[in-house]
Curated annotation (Swiss-Prot):
Organism ancestry: Eukaryota, Metazoa, Chordata, Craniata, Vertebrata
Modification sites for Phosphoserine: S62, S68, S162
Function: Non-catalytic component of the 20S core proteasome complex involved in the proteolytic degradation of most intracellular proteins. This complex plays numerous essential roles within the cell by associating with different regulatory particles. Associated with two 19S regulatory particles, forms the 26S proteasome and thus participates in the ATP-dependent degradation of ubiquitinated proteins.
Entry GO CC: cytoplasm; cytosol; nucleus; proteasome core complex; proteasome core complex, beta-subunit complex
Record's keyword terms, sorted: Acetylation, Cytoplasm, Glycoprotein, Nucleus, Phosphoprotein, Proteasome
Subcellular location: Cytoplasm; Nucleus
Modified residues annotated as Phosphotyrosine in this record: Y150
Transmembrane segments: none
Signal peptide per UniProt: none
Protein name: Proteasome subunit beta type-1
GO terms, biological process: proteolysis involved in protein catabolic process
Pfam families on file: Proteasome
Oligomer and partners: The 26S proteasome consists of a 20S proteasome core and two 19S regulatory subunits. The 20S proteasome core is a barrel-shaped complex made of 28 subunits that are arranged in four stacked rings. The two outer rings are each formed by seven alpha subunits, and the two inner rings are formed by seven beta subunits. The proteolytic activity is exerted by three beta-subunits PSMB5, PSMB6 and PSMB7. Interacts with SERPINB2. Interacts with RFPL4A.
Protein family per UniProt: Belongs to the peptidase T1B family.
Length: 241
């Protein structure tokens, strides 16, 4: 009996002296995933697109770094926002960047935003049995120069939207976007096209509000603005507690 117990003992531990809530050997489980928090958001306008994220990288009640933006530039017209497990975010973006270089060398041109979205869908679906723990949002300009946003689930299903939020504070941001950008559940309201200035004010306001309520969102806001002139970035401070 003691030999069977010793077989499941850890280094320097005697499980015979430790209480057990159930009968059976001690099982040690390894989880390949971790949730590192963070929030991403994208809004598409008539001739622009905005992709924004906070910069906090945390796990549980620990903050690993306060300077980890979740927006990655893919081309001069496309930006991707990734939230979830940071290790999978880095791996996935490196794979996408390698595919984009191969495409540019083969075709002598950059891949379009819609083609990048379709490619990302196949990459995610190929890992459906051991998926990347990443929620992706792509923002950019389409072939006609109009703003486009594509949202994904972890196994590759995607759709084109005008606005989308993902990550730890998405449940707070999405209803605000539905109301202020999509004019949902509103009556007798004129649907005015969204301007870049109003979209920027809205992005800043919703992230400031989210940082007040979500412990995984904060420190700073990184905004990537995609227009026909290229991509420019802005940084806005958020609360750091």
């Amino acid at each position: 009996m003691l030999s069977s117990v010793a077989a499941y003992s850890g280094a320097g531990r005697d499980l015979a002296m430790e209480p057990h809530s159930s009968v059976g050997p001690l099982q040690l489980r390894f989880s390949p995933y971790a949730f590192n928090g963070g929030t991403v958001l994208a809004i598409a306008g008539e001739d622009f697109s905005i992709v924004a994220s906070d910069t906090r990288l945390s796990e549980g009640f620990s903050i690993h770094t306060r300077d980890s933006p979740k927006c990655y530039k893919l081309t001069d017209k496309t930006v991707i926002g990734c939230s979830g497990f940071h290790g999978d975010c880095l791996t996935l973006t490196k794979i996408i960047e390698a595919r984009l270089k191969m495409y540019k060398h083969s075709n002598n041109k950059a891949m379009t935003t819609g083609a990048i979205a379709a490619m990302l869908s196949t990459i995610l679906y190929s890992r459906r049995f051991f998926p990347y723990y990443v929620y992706n949002i792509i923002g950019g300009l389409d072939e006609e120069g109009k703003g486009a946003v594509y949202s994904f689930d972890p196994v590759g299903s995607y759709q084109r939207d005008s606005f989308k939020a993902g990550g730890s504070a998405s449940a707070m941001l999405q209803p605000l976007l539905d109301n202020q950008v999509g004019f949902k559940n509103m009556q007798n309201v004129e649907h005015v096209p969204l301007s870049l200035d109003r979209a920027m004010r809205l992005v800043k306001d919703v992230f400031i509000s989210a940082a007040e309520r979500d412990v995984y969102t904060g420190d700073a806001l990184k905004v990537c603005i995609v227009t026909k002139e290229g991509i420019r970035g802005e940084t806005v401070p958020l609360r750091k507690d």
